[in-house]
């Protein structure tokens, strides 16, 4: 059997926009190639730039698995630089951001490592990212137990997005998504906030602390932001609840003006994750005259390319 130390040698590292400066003209290369998937990258870059320039409400929507990778730091930097002013994501994003902010280290691994062996070695596997037991559950539990009593001491009811700001306020890691959102006053909307370690620990602590999370306040906020905006756009990475919650709320003001989907899901099974923007038009979630594109590919490749193009 492989030694645990041999598997946990190379940590995953966060990147920032500064790491992408030398690639700021890379989309021009894809424009020359153009064929097949390159067209999506070129169009996605153009729409993203126009969205950031013209839309006053700009959604960054992504799934939690990406926060276990080096994209975590890039998401934080995109928030810091003001490219996006609202985030919609899933419960695991909070787990991974807290774990990595408070000492948890994730490691480079492989999709093909024996999972029974990993369990015996007390290592979780997330795709090809290895997460030692001690870098995940216990870290999150300790953080919630440490900070939640002081956060809820004088507030017995709090919205989820304000609760996340409170945790972000207590983070010193410059690559933290929660910290960046707190610093920039960007709300993080997590409709499935109870789905994960963070949510489970909130439930456990609620049995000892007298507090409630008011998710209706999160809905009120997103409603107010959408109805007060002139134009809205979204970079939607992955599918599931974070994708749907983003496009769902935009239907009530005739839909998004801009939409960039990055996905590996297909539409043949009727899934929300695989649905293209044109289907959302039929639901009033994206405007018929909106500028939109679907880019098929791994987000860990596509997102850095699009982010780099913002620097050109």
UniProtKB/Swiss-Prot annotation:
GO cellular component, one term: cytoplasm
GO molecular function ontology, one term from the record: deoxyhypusine synthase activity
Keywords (A to Z) from UniProt: Hypusine biosynthesis, NAD, Transferase
Pfam families: DS
Active-site positions on this chain: 285 (nucleophile)
Family to which the UniProt record says this protein belongs: Belongs to the deoxyhypusine synthase family.
Annotated function: Catalyzes the NAD-dependent oxidative cleavage of spermidine and the subsequent transfer of the butylamine moiety of spermidine to the epsilon-amino group of a specific lysine residue of the eIF-5A precursor protein to form the intermediate deoxyhypusine residue.
Protein name: Probable deoxyhypusine synthase
Organism: Saccharolobus solfataricus (strain ATCC 35092 / DSM 1617 / JCM 11322 / P2) (Sulfolobus solfataricus)
């Amino acid at each position: 059997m492989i030694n645990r130390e041999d598997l946990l040698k190379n940590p995953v590292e966060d990147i920032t926009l500064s790491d992408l400066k030398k690639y700021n003209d890379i989309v021009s290369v894809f424009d020359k190639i153009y064929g097949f998937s390159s067209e999506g990258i070129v169009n996605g870059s153009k729409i993203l730039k126009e969205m950031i320039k013209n839309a006053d409400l700009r959604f960054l929507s992504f799934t939690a698995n990406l926060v276990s990778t080096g994209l975590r730091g890039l998401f934080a930097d995109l928030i810091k630089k003001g490219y996006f002013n609202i985030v919609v994501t899933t419960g695991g994003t909070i787990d991974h951001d807290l774990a990595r902010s408070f000492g948890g280290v994730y490691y480079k691994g492989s999709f093909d490592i024996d999972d029974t062996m990993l369990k015996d070695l007390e290592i979780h596997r997330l795709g090809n990212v290895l997460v030692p037991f001690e870098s995940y559950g216990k870290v999150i539990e300790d953080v919630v137990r440490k900070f939640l009593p002081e956060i809820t001491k004088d507030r017995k009811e709090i919205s989820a997005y304000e609760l996340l700001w409170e945790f972000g306020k207590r983070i010193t890691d410059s690559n933290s998504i929660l910290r960046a959102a707190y610093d920039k006053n960007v709300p993080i909307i997590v409709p499935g906030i109870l789905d994960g370690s963070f949510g489970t620990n909130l439930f456990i602590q609620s049995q000892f602390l007298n507090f409630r999370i008011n998710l209706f306040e999160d809905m009120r906020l997103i409603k107010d932001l959408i109805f007060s905006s002139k134009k809205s756009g979204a970079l939607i990475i992955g599918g599931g609840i974070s994708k749907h919650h983003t496009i769902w709320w935009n239907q009530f003001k005739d839909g998004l003006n801009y939409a960039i989907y990055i996905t590996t899901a297909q539409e043949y099974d009727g899934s929300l994750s695989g649905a293209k923007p044109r289907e959302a038009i039929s639901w009033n979630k994206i405007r018929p005259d909106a500028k939109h594109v679907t880019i098929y590919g791994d987000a860990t490749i596509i997102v850095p390319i699009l982010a780099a193009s913002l620097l050109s």
